[in-house]
């Protein structure tokens, strides 16, 4: 079967158009890669997040960082804090929080996925995430983010207040080497676009009564306001490393002036005698200097006698402090000084000469 010159010309033109069209399509596709997956906010329904657009919020237009809770019991406080961060241009928001379920043992995790929220999707800054991974400062680990509420509870407020921003989500396992935290904070300081905001998603005292929670919170707030890095690891908070990362970043930015409020679950729920209190700090940081000094605290006991029945209990492995240390051992955390009146001598000699 033969083809005329006209037919061959038409076929050739069609082939060229097809190739050009395919090339254009390919170029467009490769320029804007679609994230390979999606995570989801803690709840799909908007009402779980309280009043996301509260009135009377004082704007912190120069703020470069913040601390919020991830406990939706205080949803309105989260909303007020994040709304106060609104600025004309916020290219990237970084959220850093604890890996509650230790899904990345001893590690720093980042996500390349977007998050679906009641107000739409928030996409990741994949270039920045890839750069963090390439610098060996973190690993991409989507498994961590499947159920990590320190991130999933906060992203809806980011999407609502900053609809055009990109997200970098980071989780930290407990007790990461300080050098790794400082290296990541330094990287963020150097690579984040101007106008970006870093948010630490952290809760404070856990499983204590109101008096003990207030005691620990006073120490925590004072240490954070003073950028007292030496005290961070002993604070009664669920992610000291997240706070260390935030404060290190803010120190490099010169944004150390804090505006802060505190509350706790006993106040919110009107249960003043609760013995299972969770407390919260809501803070923003703007250009300026830190508080001049941190706080010191001390714990005082009465008489202590370590002989007789007490000695027997100790030798049998009985935990003498089981009922005061709390479920997570938090009551005795972070003390600068412990004072007690010791009755009787302490000696390694078991018999008199």
Summary of predicted features, one role per range:
Residues 1-18, 25:
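N-terminal Sec-pathway targeting helices
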Residues 29-271:
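Active-site histidine-anchored catalytic micro-motif
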Residues 59-66, 92, 279, 294-297, ...:
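A generic secondary-structure signal marking the coil-to-beta-strand transition
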Residues 22-30:
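Juxtamembrane cytosolic interface motif at the C-terminal end of transmembrane helices
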Residues 264-291:
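Long, Lys/Arg- and hydrophobic-enriched amphipathic alpha-helices
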Residues 290-353:
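Acidic, metal/ion-coordinating pockets
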């Amino acid at each position: 079967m033969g083809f005329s010159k006209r037919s061959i010309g038409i076929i050739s033109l069609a082939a060229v158009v097809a190739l050009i069209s395919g090339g254009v399509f390919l170029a467009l596709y490769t320029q804007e890669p679609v994230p390979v997956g999606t995570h989801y906010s803690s709840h799909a329904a908007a009402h779980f997040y309280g009043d996301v657009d509260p009135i009377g919020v004082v704007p912190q237009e120069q703020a470069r960082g913040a601390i919020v809770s991830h406990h939706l019991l205080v949803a309105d406080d989260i909303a007020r804090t994040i709304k106060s961060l609104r600025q004309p241009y916020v290219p990237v928001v970084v959220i850093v929080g604890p890996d509650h379920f230790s899904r990345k043992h001893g590690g720093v995790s980042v996500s390349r996925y977007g998050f679906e929220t009641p107000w739409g999707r928030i996409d990741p800054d994949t270039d920045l995430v890839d750069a963090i991974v390439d610098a060996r400062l973190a690993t991409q680990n989507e498994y961590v983010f499947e159920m990590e509420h320190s991130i999933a509870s906060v992203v809806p407020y980011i999407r609502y207040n900053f609809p055009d921003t990109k997200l970098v989500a980071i989780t930290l396992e407990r007790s990461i080497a300080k050098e790794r935290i400082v290296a990541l904070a330094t990287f963020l300081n150097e690579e984040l676009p101007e106008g970006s905001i870093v948010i630490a998603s952290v809760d404070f005292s856990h499983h204590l009564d109101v008096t003990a929670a207030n005691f620990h919170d006073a120490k925590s707030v004072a240490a954070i306001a003073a950028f007292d890095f030496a005290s961070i690891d002993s604070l009664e908070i669920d992610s000291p490393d997240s706070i260390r990362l935030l404060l290190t970043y803010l120190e490099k930015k010169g944004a150390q002036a804090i505006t802060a409020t505190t509350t706790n679950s006993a106040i919110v729920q009107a249960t003043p005698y609760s013995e299972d209190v969770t407390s919260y700090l809501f803070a923003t940081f703007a250009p300026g200097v830190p508080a001049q000094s941190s706080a010191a605290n001390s714990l005082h006991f009465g008489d202590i006698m370590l002989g007789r029945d007490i000695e027997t209990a100790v030798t049998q492995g009985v935990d003498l402090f089981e009922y005061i240390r709390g479920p997570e051992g938090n009551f005795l955390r972070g003390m600068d000084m412990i004072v007690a009146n010791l009755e009787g001598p302490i000696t390694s000699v078991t018999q008199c000469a």
